[in-house]
Amino acid sequence: MFRLEEKIKEKLNNKSSSELKTLTFHALLDEWLEYHIKTSGFKVTTLDNLKTRIKNIKKNSSQNLLLNKIDTKYMQTFINELSNVYSANQVKRQLGHMKEAIKYAVKFYNYPNEHILNSVTLPKKSKTIEDIEKEEAKMYNYLEMEQVIQIRDFILNDNNMQYRARILVAGAVEVQALTGMRIGELLALQVKDVDLKNKTIAINGTIHRIKCNAGFGHKDTTKTAGSKRKIAINSRIANVLKKIMLENKKMQQWEPSYVDRGFIFTTCQGNPMQGSRINKRLSSAAESLNINKKVTTHTLRHTHISLLAEMNISLKAIMKRVGHRDEKTTIKVYTHVTEKMDRELEQKLEKLVY
């Protein structure tokens, strides 16, 4: 019995060795990707991003490159080349995927060079003053509430938009600024998630722009486990949501093509709105109002963090409300706002007359 098992094992090993000789790097990546999709249990959005990164790895490497011909020197050169095209974060992820693919080759093809990527290092680029300024502009990109109101009112009075679109986009702007939700979380919001009586919202998903059985737009789980949360809302937000729900009921009654899927921020067909459309309206309104910032839906999320910081809400409470697991981003915005408040206090003290 023992000898039979040994013979079977030897036969399988020989088969793996034979297949390994003709296995290309691209074929390995494709096989690993298919295996990973079936076994990882990752959400749709994560897997779509993964597919894109694998596609980019293949785009920048030879289709006929055999796995057996690859060595550490080649991979280091390849990583260096990728870093000239993609961000440091993207290259780090790409290298991670390649390491997983190599592990797959070891497991299923008896590939002998398991540690081929272990000594490959990610290139480090020195940041220019321009890079630092761009990072700071992105990190500290928030609005004053007066500016949010200006943008909201501009959209509400924009005659180039249909009445329903004005109500929904302006509502999305205001709700985001006063809740700190990610745009995907806002668009995934359903009537059942909103408790108008107790003024709470259950944030339990995000929208992925794919076609599904019910229509266009699939509600997936939140970005992280910590992103799933329940938050309090004020009367203003409750009224905005109530008004939008009423608009949706009108659509359901009078528009035959409207399918009620339970979402709040919807198109004329009942599907979740596109975040890109809201971003376009936001950017256009900000430009028309001479707000010299790159205003996006994420700006509104930072705006909420800054608003809470100005109200002296604790860092921990802010992180819980906006669903931040990593405190890095929250701290940067929080610190920037509190430093600004300190400067304003100093200026007021200077003006005191003794």
From Swiss-Prot:
PROSITE patterns: CB, TYR_RECOMBINASE. Keywords: DNA integration, DNA recombination, DNA-binding, Hydrolase, Transferase, Viral genome integration, Virus entry into host cell. Coiled coil: none annotated. The gene is int. PANTHER family: PHAGE INTEGRASE-RELATED, PROPHAGE INTEGRASE INTD-RELATED. Residues 23-106 form the Core-binding (CB) domain. Its EC number is 2.7.7.-, 3.1.-.-. GO terms for molecular function: DNA binding; hydrolase activity; transferase activity. This is Integrase. Residues 138-347 form the Tyr recombinase domain.
